[in-house]
């Protein structure tokens, strides 16, 4: 995790890397995604957002507790719990999902697709509404999530979009 002042946004930003999650009511949260997925949760009534960044859905190996955030099967419940521990109300949670790019050759393992489908399935299981999904299969992206309005700015190599 890296905290810095972003001169373009004129804001304090916390950048998370694969395996990390962060919850805030003040700081913008950012990450860079390819095949990984970021789940961004918000409780607007409590002005709270959280973001995770997971690499794969699961692993067949034993995972040490400090590495669980790298796997969606752990990362999504961990983010939900972190939101609740920071004052969110589960019935207020809403989600936006990003990433899931497939850079590999046609016919190879589709890690990005598996990651994105898992996020949708898991949030549906938890009955958390998904307000936006950005799973364009061909583009990497950098995302910035804002706690005050749940706006997420997505920067692609060829432009910007707001969700």
Swiss-Prot record:
Q: GO MF annotations for this entry? A: protein-glutamine glutaminase activity
Q: Which UniProt keywords apply?
A: Chemotaxis, Hydrolase
CDD domains attached here? CheD (cd16352)
Reaction(s) catalysed (UniProt annotation): L-glutaminyl-[protein] + H2O = L-glutamyl-[protein] + NH4(+)
Q: Which cysteines are joined by disulfide bonds?
A: none
Q: Does the keyword Cell wall biogenesis/degradation apply?
A: no
Q: Which Gene3D superfamilies match?
A: 3.30.1330.200
Q: Which GO terms describe its biological process?
A: chemotaxis
Q: Any idea of its EC number? A: 3.5.1.44
Q: Does the keyword Hydrolase apply?
A: yes
* The protein's role, per its UniProt record: Probably deamidates glutamine residues to glutamate on methyl-accepting chemotaxis receptors (MCPs), playing an important role in chemotaxis.
**Family named by the database record:** Belongs to the CheD family.
- PANTHER family named in the record: CHEMORECEPTOR GLUTAMINE DEAMIDASE CHED-RELATED
Q: Which HAMAP family does the entry mention?
A: CheD
Protein name stated in the entry: Probable chemoreceptor glutamine deamidase CheD
Q: Which organism is it from?
A: Borrelia garinii subsp. bavariensis (strain ATCC BAA-2496 / DSM 23469 / PBi)
Q: Identify the taxonomic lineage of the organism of origin.
A: Bacteria, Pseudomonadati, Spirochaetota, Spirochaetia, Spirochaetales
């Amino acid at each position: 995790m890296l905290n810095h002042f972003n001169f373009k946004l004129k804001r304090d930003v916390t950048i998370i890397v694969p395996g990390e999650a962060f919850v805030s009511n003040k700081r913008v949260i950012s990450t860079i995604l390819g095949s990984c997925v970021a789940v961004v949760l918000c409780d607007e009534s409590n002005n709270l957002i959280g973001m995770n960044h997971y690499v794969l859905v699961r692993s067949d190996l034993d995972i040490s507790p400090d590495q669980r955030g790298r796997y969606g099967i752990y990362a999504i419940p961990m983010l939900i719990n972190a939101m609740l521990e920071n004052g969110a109300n589960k019935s207020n949670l809403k989600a936006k999902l990003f990433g899931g790019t497939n850079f590999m050759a046609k016919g190879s393992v589709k890690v990005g697709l598996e990651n994105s489908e898992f996020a949708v399935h898991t949030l549906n299981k938890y009955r958390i509404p998904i307000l936006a999904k950005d799973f364009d299969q061909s583009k990497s992206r950098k995302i910035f999530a804002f706690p005050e309005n749940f706006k997420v700015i997505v920067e692609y190599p060829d432009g910007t979009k707001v969700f």
